[in-house]
Amino acid sequence: MQANFQKYNLQFKQASGTSRGVLTTKETYILEISKEEKKGIGECAIFRGLSYDDVPEYEEKLNWLCQNINQDFDILKKDLKHFPSIIFGLEQAFLNLKNGSDLYFPSEFTEGKDFIKINGLIWMGNAEFMQSQIEEKLDQGFDC
């Protein structure tokens, strides 16, 4: 089995306030594992300044994972215990490798017919901006 990753810098459509500052970009890493003719893809996503595993050696740990991808999964998880976003991406990639192009969890959401009702994200801002987002989410059917 082989593994590699690619870093992407996503640009937010608008500056987005959090409890720890304003975000305009987001780094994410796409992990790809391959075995014979099959491949699996997973996302290792961190928010700088917010994520538990936002540490200087993040890419170094991704490189380590790629070099050690043939280790037992439990050994990989143990060595990655302080990098939950990398574990998540690795689990996604293994599921994708196992299931091929099939969706992980077929649903109304993955078919674009519905949304995840608990993920109505509200960005920090002044009271008027936050209130308008709340009203918009309620109008869209978010209720929790």
Regions found by a protein language model. Give the residues of each.
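N-terminal capping/lid subdomain adjacent to the active-site entrance of alpha/beta enzymes
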Residues: M1-C144
